[in-house]
Amino acid sequence: MPFTLGQRWISDTESELGLGTVVALDARMVTIMFPATGENRLYARNDSPVTRVMFNPGDTVTSHEGWQLKIEDVKEENGLLAYTGTRLDTDEADVMLREVMLDSRLVFSKPQDRLFAGQIDRMDRFSLRYRARKFQSEQYRMPWSGLRGQRTSLIPHQLNIAHDVGRRHAPRVLLADEVGLGKTIEAGMILHQQLLSGAAERVLIVVPETLQHQWLVEMLRRFNLRFSLFDDERYAEAQHDADNPFETEQLVICSLDFVRRSKQRLEHLCDAEWDLLVVDEAHHLVWSENAPSREYMAIEQLAERVPGILLLTATPEQLGLESHFARLRLLDPNRFHDFDVFVEEQQNYRPVADAVAMLLAGKHLSNDELNTLSDLIGEQDIEPLLHTANSDRDGADAARQELVSMLMDRHGTSRVLFRNTRNGVKGFPKRELHTIKLPLPTQYQTAIKVSGIMGARKSAEERARDMLYPEQIYQEFEGDTGTWWNFDPRVEWLMGYLTAHRSQKVLVICAKAATALQLEQVLREREGIRAAVFHEGMSIIERDRAAAWFGEEDSGAQVLLCSEIGSEGRNFQFASKLVMFDLPFNPDLLEQRIGRLDRIGQAHDIQIHVPYLENTAQSVLVRWFHEGLDAFEHTCPTGRTIYDQVHSDLIGYLASPENTDGFDDLIKTCREKHDALKIQLEQGRDRLLEIHSNGGEKAQALAESIEEQDDDTSLISFAMNLFDIVGINQDDRGENMIVLTPSDHMLVPDFPGLPEDGCTITFERDVALSREDAQFITWEHPLIRNGLDLILSGDTGSSTISLLKNKALPVGTLLLELIYVVEAQAPKQLQLNRFLPATPVRLMLDKNGTNLAAQVEFESFNRQLSAVNRHTGSKLVNAVQQDVHAILQQGEAQIEKAARALIDSARREADEKLSAELSRLEALRAVNPNIRDDELAAIESNRQQVLESLDQASWRLDALRLIVVTHQ
């Protein structure tokens, strides 16, 4: 290589050193100093890994003093270059800048600059970059973007609600599905969509204290959303880091009690500028016109400051219209301001629901019924539609569906309230109860008597809670030596049951963690039964491992022993046998226990086994749950209401189970109340609301589309390619699972989302649902999204050289593959990616500027090419630099037309879609007051900003590949 003192060179292997200067030479070696980093490098004169930096007319360079020069002419004198041109800060012409005076902190960011500077990437990195651009652009444009990445079954009614609400501006809705239909999952899907699209960035979730960990686990395991749990301790710690502790995290979970207890804390929460507020168990927010509770007022303050709200409740509105109104009032206080007016409105919607029932029944409508429909949709001429709907002609069904759709748009609360019931959603198993009455051991009888004497001052409720768990009473007196499991007949029964059903998975739930741990030891030591334990003292990772062991078919645990709190948020549909070793105190917890198995997707009927001790609080509770509420074999929406009504009487029987006087009457009363309330619920079922919430065929089609996308293998090949290039080790674990671990030679030291000790992944939804230790990889998973960002935000793969062996073309023929990106810059919340994500446009130009891209498909062409090492590549580039410059100029001329077409198409689509949505809502505003003014204003503002941003869209060269034809 011809070196001269003062020449500027760049290192091929350490480009971060910047621009180097030749400072010493001898016969064999050259010393190059890199002023930007203060380092020297000694290279062999022959074959050193450095490239001469030479700029061309049209380039802009920076001097060491900071001013810039637009080059018009380049002269070489004694091996050194001098650039002449116009100085950009003063517009002075004919300014000369010698190469030794160039800024040393030079970074080559443009693909063509990197190519000419010898910074040539591996060929496979170029291919990965193009694929990453292509896939990322396609994913953003998918209509179900944000709905595929969660570790959940594809259940139509959940997808329908999430798809509807998740795309709204600052949604304010009440999710009121019955127990077991997945409100938490619906809320998670909505959050996931809003966060992924940029519509929301800061989220606050407020839940009862006992559900904090359930939400933490669900959000992380199902949606890869890493929330922070704020309690008194975390709040105090965060006060050292910020004036407002809640501004230290973007995603926060805290308890309702935590929010209510401190005025200062509530002020900090209100000032923290959340985008979305989620409140679970919203029926606990007690309200009356004259005396709202402190909890309600706290959430009301937050609701006034936070644009988007999701309220979750399982309590049907028929069991408390006033509290139902209170929840709607939180969503839109202007719309729901007067309870009496609300009651009257609800009664007026009855004809709407009846009309829908008539249409769906498919019967011919009477004149009165036709008149009712005309009155309900009075602002439009629907006579032709009614005529078709009431005929036997083709199109009658379609006409009926259109009328139902029109009625739904006019329905009172269908935009703010979603409610699915088990009657309206198919796919649930039956529940069969097996009670096992067992004798009360004398040891327990003695312990209970002594406890009664010593605990005489305890309240009836405390005594009742004690009496449910006699093993706890016994251990209080006997201490750690109290081996209750040696004589408790429930333990003998459990061991017998498990040994008789060795091949079947059994979930055992008990109230206390200590009971679960002791049972595991007994089962292991006495019968060699493999049992996993699951309790609140374990970390999330430990619980994952226990759940995964239970989920393994052949070598896994036969039994999972759960404590009450430990099992929250976990579902085990692959098991269908449930043993309740003891009973919970209230119907909600009972339903929660059964709900671990009784989910949509459960393939078998659920066998519920309840071994109980006679003449104890357990025997009282078994009868009350089963005979009074029918709560074991059916979901019990009436349970909490009846429990609140008979609470004190029930507590009395539980505290003194030997006193059975009047208990039969209590059970009879409860059953009558239960049956009456069920009839009331059934009669009050809002069929229209259920149809709207369920989504029907539209929801089914959405689920099928996502399922089809799940089967697409392009993600797997892309992910494997990505992991290879980033330097992540992959170890096939079998059962469609792969273990990823960091290597010593990664593209970046810490790959975001990959733990130090690695992780297990799967691309199969079914595997992810049964194996909680395996992460479910989709295009929306952080590992893939972070990988895409890593490749595309830097210059990885932006310039490369390949050889094409093709004897049909002359040796030395040049082709230049150019990847342009058309994009628009805008705030994330505008969700511009729906219309114009960063979109790659590929040109394949020959020396004459002919674009061959349409004839030469990328993947098949890529397979015909071979790589060139960096040193040879640099020599090739230097030899053909002038030709490459000429082809690049032709590329710039050709891209404008293609880019303009893309931008114009995106602008038309955005204008049509956003204008249509605005027009639809404005038309409905006249007949449905649940459409908020601020929502309409936001859509119009959004439309204007989107169109302005698209007008500013531009394009740039993102990557290029120089291809040279060879015959060898």
From Swiss-Prot:
GO process terms (BP): regulation of DNA-templated transcription
One MF annotation (Gene Ontology) recorded for this entry: DNA binding
EC number: 3.6.4.-
Superkingdom to which the source organism belongs: Bacteria
One Pfam family cited in the UniProt record for this chain: RapA_C
Enzyme class, UniProt record, top EC level: hydrolase
Keyword DNA-binding: yes
Binding-site positions, ATP: D177, E178, V179, G180, L181, G182, K183, T184
Helicase C-terminal domain location: 490-644
Domain named Helicase ATP-binding: residues: 164-334
Record key words, sorted: Activator, ATP-binding, DNA-binding, Helicase, Hydrolase, Nucleotide-binding, Transcription, Transcription regulation
HAMAP family: Helicase_RapA
Protein name: RNA polymerase-associated protein RapA
UniProt source species: Enterobacter sp. (strain 638)
Lineage: Bacteria, Pseudomonadati, Pseudomonadota, Gammaproteobacteria, Enterobacterales
